[in-house]
């Protein structure tokens, strides 16, 4: 089901960032009639990641009674962290890998501001370099934030673009990067992969790798299977459609102590009950309410909880599993059957790996805190954690070492984990030769496959926030959204939208969300230019016949 698109409008005075063209999307009008006492409404949020915590926040701030059920022992979902014991008995931290908190993540930042109004718990990184095999590094430092000057300056400076390569670019197709209008652009590129889109552009090989490494692989996806519309939305969100820039912030310490534990305490102060270590098994109707069966993972212990509304804020596997185990959810009519089929079609991305190393010596001082790579085999990026995380800095100072993290995205089926682990370390030694003589005093290895793959299937077949069951809404980065948002920001945005849907359906006020501009920054000019070039090409082709 497609959400009703409302005309964005600027909100008075407040701006979530520096971009004057950021758009505010108001919530639906509250349902007519006398609104209920919000305290008489109870919502169960299934999932304590970004989407679930955002939905819980949006509901609780309007007085609704909220219960959060989270399968893991800590909040944060796929952006959680947890303690590990190092060989000397001290405590280190592990996570599922590096996450960039971009300045255009307006709705996620709104959540974080509840406990950190000035976002002091985030620190900026000065650059996001990308090292290409065979030499050459792209850098985003010092590039203007405002389009089109950011694009012009990046192309001028980047070794990925040269005059010969630029001459081969299809100008008509390239103008499509600027000629966008979301959500219509999502539909227009149904069936087109990221690789197809770049084929149309005729980008130079270096620039093609840059686009795929910076955008597509960060979605844990093979570019031949990843949506071209999503890739175009990312170009828009991070580069040609937003004036916030491509540089980003990172938490000053581990995700749990910096972000989610403070938010958990804030939610507790609003009356939210958070239960970790609880896995929801099925959702069913019980009169005019919904009932959820939940228990400890891998345990026969279970209990029922009733609610007036339910938010499913789960990863693809969790969402598919709960809906499949809840035969009546969504109703038995055609709309319900179609919705359940769409949920079953949500795809999981290939697996990814994270290797964190506690080394007995220092990485060279000039190494970037975070380095993306292209053409370095399975190695996609390298993080030197003591450059930005306090706990890693303290360990490095005390032991004269470094804490380094290696990522490998979109692993092929049947990957030999032992061979991959060895390969990643060897690639690190080639990139940072000073590490070849260092010893790992501790290692943490993680392989997961629970991220969403936004494929080339029709955009309208992806399940959205709204479901055929008015008491049930979805949230998460696997959920379709009309706006040009992605990853953590899609999770937060759909969390706010899910809360607003329930609130306004009960006659209570919602919150609304912000986004980068939903259309190109240059009005009709790119579209006119594209059509002009297309007409000229068609005329030339007829003349040559």
Regions found by a protein language model. Give the residues of each.
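N-terminal Rossmann-like FAD-binding beta1-loop-alpha1 element of flavoenzymes
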Residues: 39-68
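Active-site-proximal substrate-binding core of FAD-dependent oxidoreductases
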Residues: 501-545
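Active-site/ligand-binding neighborhood in enzyme catalytic cores
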Residues: 5, 9, 173-282
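FAD-binding beta-loop-beta segment adjacent to the flavin cofactor pocket
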Residues: 391-398, 448-482
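A conserved FAD-binding loop/helix module that cradles the flavin
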Residues: 479-502, 506
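Mobile amphipathic helical/loop "lid" adjacent to a hydrophobic cofactor/ligand pocket
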Residues: 108-109, 113-114, 119-228
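Glycine-rich FAD pyrophosphate-binding loop
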Residues: 60-85
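Mid-domain catalytic core of redox enzymes
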Residues: 2-19, 23, 39, 278-404, ...
């Amino acid at each position: 089901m497609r959400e009703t698109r409302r005309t964005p409008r600027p909100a008075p005075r407040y701006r979530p960032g520096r971009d004057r063209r950021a758009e505010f999307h108001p919530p639906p009008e509250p349902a007519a009639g006398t609104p209920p006492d919000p305290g008489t409404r109870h919502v169960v949020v299934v999932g304590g990641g970004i989407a679930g915590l955002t939905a819980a926040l949006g509901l609780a701030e309007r007085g609704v009674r909220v219960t959060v059920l989270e399968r893991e022992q800590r909040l944060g979902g796929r952006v959680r962290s947890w303690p590990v014991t190092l060989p000397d008995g001290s405590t280190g931290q592990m996570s599922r890998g590096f996450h960039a908190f971009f300045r255009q993540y307006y709705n996620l930042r709104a959540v974080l501001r509840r406990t950190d109004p000035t976002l002091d718990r985030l620190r900026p990184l000065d650059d996001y370099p990308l090292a290409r095999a065979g030499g050459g590094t792209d850098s985003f430092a010092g590039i203007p934030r405002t389009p089109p000057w950011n694009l012009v300056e990046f192309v001028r400076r980047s070794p990925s673009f040269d005059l010969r390569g630029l001459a081969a670019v299809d100008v008509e197709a390239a103008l499509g990067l600027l000629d966008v209008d979301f959500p219509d652009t999502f539909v227009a590129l149904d069936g087109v992969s990221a690789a197809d889109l770049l084929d149309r552009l005729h980008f130079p090989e270096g620039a093609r790798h840059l686009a795929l490494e910076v955008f597509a692989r960060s979605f844990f996806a093979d570019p031949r299977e990843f949506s071209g519309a999503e890739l175009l939305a990312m170009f828009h969100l991070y580069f040609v459609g937003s004036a916030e820039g491509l540089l980003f912030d990172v938490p000053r310490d581990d995700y749990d102590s910096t972000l989610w534990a403070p938010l958990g305490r804030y939610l507790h102060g609003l009356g939210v009950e958070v239960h970790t270590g609880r896995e929801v098994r099925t959702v069913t109707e019980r009169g005019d309410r919904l009932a959820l069966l939940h228990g400890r993972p891998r345990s026969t212990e279970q209990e029922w909880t009733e609610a007036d509304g339910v938010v499913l804020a789960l990863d693809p596997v969790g969402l598919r599993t709960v809906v499949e185990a809840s035969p009546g959810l969504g109703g038995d009519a055609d709309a319900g059957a179609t919705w359940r089929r769409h949920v079953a079609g949500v795809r999981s991305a290939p697996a990814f790996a994270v290797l964190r190393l506690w080394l007995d010596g220092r990485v060279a001082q000039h190494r970037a805190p975070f380095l993306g790579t292209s053409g370095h085999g399975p190695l996609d990026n390298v993080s030197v954690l003591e450059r930005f995380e306090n706990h890693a800095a303290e360990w490095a100072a005390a032991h004269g070492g470094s804490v380094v993290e290696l990522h490998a995205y979109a692993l092929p089926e049947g990957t030999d984990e032992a061979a991959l682990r060895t390969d990643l370390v060897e690639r690190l030694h080639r990139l940072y030769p000073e590490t070849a003589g260092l010893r790992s005093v501790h290692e943490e290895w993680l392989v997961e496959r629970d991220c969403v793959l936004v494929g080339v299937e029709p955009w309208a077949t992806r399940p959205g926030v709204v479901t055929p069951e008015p008491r049930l809404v979805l949230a998460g980065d696997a959920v379709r959204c009309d706006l040009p948002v992605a990853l953590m920001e899609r999770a937060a945005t759909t969390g706010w939208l899910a809360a607003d849907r329930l609130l306004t359906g009960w006659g209570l006020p919602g919150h609304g969300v912000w986004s980068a501009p939903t259309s190109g920054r240059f009005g009709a000019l790119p579209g006119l230019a594209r059509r002009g070039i297309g007409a000229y090409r068609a005329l030339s082709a007829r003349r040559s016949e």
